[in-house]
Regions:
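C-terminal regulatory or interaction extensions
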Residues: 1-212
Length: 212
């Protein structure tokens, strides 16, 4: 098997993401695991919200919804050691200079989504685009978030923390700064439904970049 897909995504990362969906999905819900390949990302959605909090995904310890299925994947070496799969994915993506995975878990919809961006960390074109924000003295974490927002279209506090590894206090400060600078526009007014979309400055930078 090839070590990487055509997009440069490590094969093991994609395999682990798919296996993870089958190990942790809810089989009480009669719906297939959905694997959607967009031009810039892969999203894998399975029935069943995460039994672990999103913040603790990737930390030691595993809560398998289907232990017998998990055992089969582990015994056949199709899955990493219990509780280490996400951690291994992050390491491999970092080694390949790609963004870390992001996750969404919904109790209401009873679904879990894992997202893999097919984008290498800030390349030459990205650097050129990000120069348009130099006046705002953005951190590397904020710049990474802007690349994510450009590729996906929306960003929330949780996604920011998953991308950067900062705590909730720092992520809130970073996002507020970009909102006050009109780089981002805030939508929603509560912790559960607040997210961010491109603001006036962000949209203007894209228009200029496309004309160059």
């Amino acid at each position: 098997l090839q070590s990487k897909t055509e997009s440069g995504l490590p094969y093991i990362v994609l395999r682990e993401a798919i296996v993870n969906a089958f190990i942790h999905r809810s089989y009480k819900v009669n719906s297939p695991v959905q694997i959607i390949r967009y031009s810039n990302r892969i999203e894998i959605t399975n029935a069943g919200y995460s039994l672990k909090s999103i913040e603790s995904i990737g930390e030691p310890g595993s809560l398998a919804r289907n232990p017998h299925i998990a055992a089969i994947f582990h015994d056949t070496n199709l899955a990493e050691t219990k509780g280490t799969g996400i951690k291994s994915m992050r390491k491999l993506l970092m080694k390949s200079d790609m963004m870390p995975p992001t996750f969404e878990s919904s109790h209401a919809a009873n679904t879990f989504t894992l997202r893999l961006l097919l984008h290498h960390l800030i390349n030459e074109k990205d650097h050129h685009w990000l120069m348009k924000f130099d006046a705002f003295l953005l951190s590397d974490n904020q710049k990474t978030a802007l690349i994510f927002l450009r590729e996906v279209g929306a960003l929330d506090n949780l996604s920011y923390r998953q991308l950067t590894g900062v705590n909730i206090l720092q992520s809130s400060m970073d996002l507020r700064k970009m909102v006050s600078s009109e780089i981002l526009q805030q939508k929603g007014n509560s912790k559960k439904n607040t997210y961010y979309v491109p603001g006036k400055i962000f949209l203007a930078s894209l228009e200029v970049h496309q004309q160059e």
